[in-house]
């Protein structure tokens, strides 16, 4: 489908452009590997507050993650015999399902360069998603008191972040053309009565290759990011911690 990337907004929430490495993976990545990459970059920013930030755009191999304090009651399977890898991690929120066909975004940003306010940051991530969907002709919706993004009552994007010393990790997951059947093994985000959806239910044939450039542009606009592009991550293990 034709997409007008020029429809994305140009107003940044930062008065100063931020040099940021952009890593894009061409193959699904194991969750624990992507988590390690974020932790490594977080450590670099702890050591050098002037270091570039980083963002990962990727897909995961199938897995389920539980946020801090998340209830295992939202897992509709035996935790000793999960249908896919299960991880308890250091982000907010309840259970999330990752799988191919879902665009996952992991910004490792220093909020001291923006606003030291996690609620502000969550709303910015929601706006990134709203702007992406607007280019596609879709009206993404927030729900009062909840975090994420909905289309016609179906949750199409989950957001869960971690933050140490104002350096972020984890991020958002947007369902593009993924198989929704495996979401039935959990109560997504712990929200009973809130079905999940994917973008190609509204735009048949929509692909990750069409959505990913829109996500890059929306992130750049929203956070004033100037991308530094390293060598492509053709294989999951290609990232070097001293990049």
UniProtKB/Swiss-Prot annotation:
Q: What does this protein do?
A: Catalyzes the transfer of endogenously produced octanoic acid from octanoyl-acyl-carrier-protein onto the lipoyl domains of lipoate-dependent enzymes. Lipoyl-ACP can also act as a substrate although octanoyl-ACP is likely to be the physiological substrate.
Spell out the protein name for this chain.
Octanoyltransferase
* Gene Ontology biological process: protein modification process
Miscellaneous comment in the UniProt entry for this protein: In the reaction, the free carboxyl group of octanoic acid is attached via an amide linkage to the epsilon-amino group of a specific lysine residue of lipoyl domains of lipoate-dependent enzymes.
Record domain BPL/LPL catalytic: where: 49-227
Against HAMAP family, the record matches this protein to: LipB
Q: Where does the record place the catalytic residues?
A: 189 (acyl-thioester intermediate)
Annotated PANTHER family = LIPOYLTRANSFERASE 2, MITOCHONDRIAL-RELATED (PTHR10993:SF7), OCTANOYLTRANSFERASE (PTHR10993)
Q: Tell me what organism the protein belongs to.
A: Prochlorococcus marinus (strain MIT 9313)
Q: What is its main location?
A: cytoplasm
State the EC number(s): 2.3.1.181
Upper lineage is: Bacteria, Bacillati, Cyanobacteriota, Cyanophyceae, Synechococcales
Any Gene Ontology CC annotation: cytoplasm
């Amino acid at each position: 489908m034709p997409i007008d990337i020029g429809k994305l907004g140009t107003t940044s929430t930062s008065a100063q452009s931020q040099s940021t490495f952009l890593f894009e993976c061409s193959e699904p990545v194991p969750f624990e590997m992507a988590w390690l990459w974020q932790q490594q970059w977080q450590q670099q920013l702890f050591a050098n507050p002037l270091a570039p930030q980083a963002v990962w755009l990727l897909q995961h191999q199938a897995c389920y993650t539980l946020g801090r304090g998340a209830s295992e009651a939202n897992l509709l399977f035996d935790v000793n015999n999960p249908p896919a890898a299960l991880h308890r991690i250091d982000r907010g929120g309840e259970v999330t399902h990752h799988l191919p066909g879902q665009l996952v975004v992991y910004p490792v940003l220093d909020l001291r360069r923006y606003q030291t306010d996690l609620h502000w940051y969550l709303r910015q991530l929601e706006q990134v998603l709203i702007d992406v969907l607007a280019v596609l002709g879709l009206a993404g919706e927030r729900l009062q008191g909840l975090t994420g993004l909905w289309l016609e009552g179906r949750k199409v994007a989950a957001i869960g972040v971690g933050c140490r010393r104002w350096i972020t990790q984890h991020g958002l997951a947007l369902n593009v053309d993924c198989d929704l059947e495996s979401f039935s093994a959990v109560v997504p985000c712990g929200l009973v009565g809130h079905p999940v959806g994917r973008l190609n239910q509204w735009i048949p044939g929509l692909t990750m290759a069409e959505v990913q450039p829109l996500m890059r542009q929306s992130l750049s606009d929203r956070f004033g990011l100037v991308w530094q592009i390293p060598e492509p991550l053709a294989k999951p293990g290609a990232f070097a911690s001293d990049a």
